[in-house]
């Protein structure tokens, strides 16, 4: 915001971050995802910006060993310049495990879909009888999207 101007309206979120993230993960709201991402740049002080948020995110990724496996260009996940390896995303799931209950996915599972033109992803956690809770990443190109769910069900049946 230009110096000297005052905001016309300031919205204060009444829901907790956990509540916002749960709804975000259910509804796949790209706008809210990007707004949450922009807020992490606020930790540097002053106005939030994409540049600040990328700086914070990249520092966090590097400090957790993700520098080579995850690349973020924006916070909604719709940019083709956002890239990840399955191993990198599985590592994120490992760190996110204490918050796995935020996922409310397909068929009542703890998973999240991702869809771009020609790319279908399903990632999350599955409770198994012999291995307990396991994390999984299925990312496929050139399919109708339903294959990722059939693969998950086949994997769950074997675990």
Each model region followed by its residue ranges:
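A small/polar active-site loop signature that marks catalytic segments
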Residues: 1-82, 86-87, 92-100
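C-terminal soluble interaction/assembly domains
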Residues: 56, 71-159
